Amino acid sequence: TSVGFISNIKGMKNTIIFDLDGTLALIDKRREVSTKPNGKLDWGKFFNSTNIKLDEPNLPVIKMAQLFSEQGFNIVILSGRSNKTETATRSWLSKNKVPFNKLIMRNSETDHFTPDWVLKKNMLDENLDINDVFLVVDDRDRVVKLWRSLGLTTFQVAEGNF
């Protein structure tokens, strides 16, 4: 027997949301080079385009995105990264074969200090139809809690108490 495309089921939701840092991208090396002697993160270094290249691909999560994309789902990446890093981010996504239909990033002019869970809710409200979201994949506890409070099935791919 053959298995048909799961997304061909009538009335099925068709959008899958992925977080980027800590979910699709493993950021340990970038965090290491961006940490000040006092232990605090230097956000300028952390979001420096050169340092973004240090990120490692989270292969199981990227494979999940590839499989869903092959099945016809819309892949949307919601990221707390500044839109000033969009070129470096798109380059990293391409190099690591991460499929996506839409990349939505933090507006560096208006959202600089917006907490990520508020930012992601705003991104959802302004850019997507919540009724079309099939699944969310994220790592951060506060953001996972937001998605689940909205009734969205959410896979948490890493410890996210930060």
Identify the residue ranges that each predicted region occupies.
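Amphipathic coiled-coil/heptad-repeat helices and related helical stalk/stem segments
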Residues: 57-61, 117-120, 140
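Alpha-helical substrate-recognition element adjacent to the catalytic core
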Residues: 11-111
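Acidic, Mg2+-coordinating phosphoryl-transfer loop and its flanking beta/alpha structural elements
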Residues: 124, 131-162
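Short, solvent-exposed polar/charged micro-motifs at secondary-structure junctions
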Residues: 87, 111-118, 145-146
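Short loop-to-alpha-helix "cap/lid" segments that border enzyme active sites
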Residues: 115-128
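A short acidic, often aromatic-flanked loop/helix-cap motif at beta-alpha or helix-coil junctions
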Residues: 108-115, 160-162
